[in-house]
């Protein structure tokens, strides 16, 4: 829905590691540029290559503005857009494991502070993350926007009554991580 809304007034180009849906975006008339990225990787050579790839991408496209999602694009594109004076916006979906290890959290905090110096707005999917970024002096409250929700469009996907069976079959698709609520899920099951 975000992409469709942006398309009404802008040319939209998506640059990301595509793991499905690339063809759906192409059918919408969107240019898709695959980007190779290891989400959890910390190899300095691979990270330098990703930064160089992003730099080339900005030179090739010359965007009017950039919207980033997830930690690496937020930080790397934030740094590059700041240097090139390209307006940019960032979306923080969650803090992830980077903020659970004190040394890594300190390093990532410094990177975010530098990357978000000139960010227009940072969108958060929950208020706790926005508060954490404020407490760490990463981004001021006047540039924070907490989204009212992210996920399933309940207008399009209406809630259905449970099947009339004695057992409910439940399928969980997601990462088994404490910070994502896996303990609460196991307790509920």
Would you name each region that the model predicts?
Residues 161-180, 186-189:
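Conserved donor-binding/catalytic core segment of Leloir-type glycosyltransferases
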Residues 20-21, 72-73, 128-130:
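Alpha-helix capping/helix-boundary segments
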Residues 1-46, 144-146:
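N-terminal strand-loop element at the rim of the active site
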Residues 45-52, 87-89, 96-118:
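Nucleotide-sugar donor phosphate/pyrophosphate-binding loop at the beta->alpha transition
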Residues 31-34, 113-159, 169-172:
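Donor nucleotide-sugar binding/catalytic pocket of nucleotide-sugar-dependent glycosyltransferases
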Residues 40, 71, 152, 175-179:
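Nucleotide-sugar-dependent glycosyltransferase donor-binding/catalytic pocket residues
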Residues 68-74, 92:
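Short His-centered aromatic/hydrophobic patch
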């Amino acid at each position: 829905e975000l992409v469709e809304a942006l398309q009404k007034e802008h040319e939209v180009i998506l640059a990301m590691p595509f793991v499905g849906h690339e063809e759906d975006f192409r059918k919408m008339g969107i240019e898709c540029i695959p980007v190779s990225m290891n989400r959890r990787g910390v190899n300095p050579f691979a990270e330098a290559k990703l930064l160089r790839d992003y730099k080339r991408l900005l030179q090739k496209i010359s965007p009017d503005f950039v919207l980033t999602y997830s930690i690496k694009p937020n930080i790397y594109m934030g740094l590059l857009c700041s240097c090139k004076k390209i307006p940019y916006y960032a979306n923080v979906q969650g803090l992830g494991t980077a903020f659970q290890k004190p040394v890594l959290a300190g390093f990532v905090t410094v990177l975010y502070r530098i990357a978000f110096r000139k960010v227009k707005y940072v969108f958060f999917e929950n208020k706790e993350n926005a508060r954490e970024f404020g407490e760490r002096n990463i981004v001021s409250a006047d540039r924070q926007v907490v989204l009212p929700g992210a996920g399933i469009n309940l207008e399009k996907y209406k809630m259905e009554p449970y099947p009339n069976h004695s057992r409910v079959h439940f399928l969980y698709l997601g990462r088994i991580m404490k910070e994502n609520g896996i303990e609460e899920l196991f307790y509920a099951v």
